Amino acid sequence: IDITGDSATVDNKGGMTVTDPDSIGILIDGDKAIVNNDGDNAISNGGTGTQINGDEATVNNNGNTTVDGQGSTGTEIAGNNVVVNQDGTLDVSGGGHGIDITGDSATVDNKGGMTVTDPDSIGILIDGDKAIVNNDGDNAISNGGTGTQVNGDEATVNNNGNTTVDGQGSTGTEIAGNNAVVNQDGTLDVSGGGHGIDITGDSATVDNKGGMTVTDPDSIGILIDGDKAIVNNDGDNAISNGGTGTQVNGDEATVNNNGKTTVDGQGSTGTEIAGNNAVVNQDGTLDVSGGGHGIDITGDSATVDNKGGMTVTDPDSI
């Protein structure tokens, strides 16, 4: 289907299979397009399911979407103020992209859950400022894949479902831009050297209410590279076997650990900050064993308020 013009509507109820480079299932050049994909979509080997070039587009993917292979994309939009509603599941592998948006003020509502695996695979990719992503279903990211990636300022990502990240190079939520906000209401489980939340930019805020489990060397629950970061860990955090719960590289960071923090094992760290004028408020209890570190700060003028009590046992535990 190839439409040039504004205010086009496509109702695709029968499902769609698109394969090979330059193959496109639905192509619209124009503003205010609406596409309803009610059937299941299977995109592979460099094909594109739905492509829209224009502002104020809306794509409703009510069926399940499977994307596999380098250059393959389920939904691709170039334009501002676009909306993608992913009610069906999203399964991305082999370096494909599930949803790819270039433009400001994009909104993605992902209710169906997301599975992303393999290097270069991305579930949701947005290049533009003021993006909003709502992940209401559970997300499983592995083997070098990325769940949600936003390149732009003032991004907001709400992870209401549970997030599981496993493997080197795997990332649940990745943002490059200033004034980013991530709300992690579901649980966050990171292992095998993956990163749960990875933000590069100043004035980032992470509200982690769902609790966090991080295990294995190089695994990091929350990683922020930038100044004036704020992290609120309201749920319980369990860090073990060389993992790191929260790591901030930048000045004037504030980390509020309101839940219980348990750290066990050599190389394991609950909260790690490299920067000056850092503040850590430990209101929940802190339990450190096996040679782990509860709070580790490198920098001048650091402040730690430990109100929750502390239990430290075993050699090298701090």
Outline where the language-model segments fall.
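Thr-biased low-complexity repeat/linker tracts and other Thr-enriched repetitive architectures
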Residues: 1-318
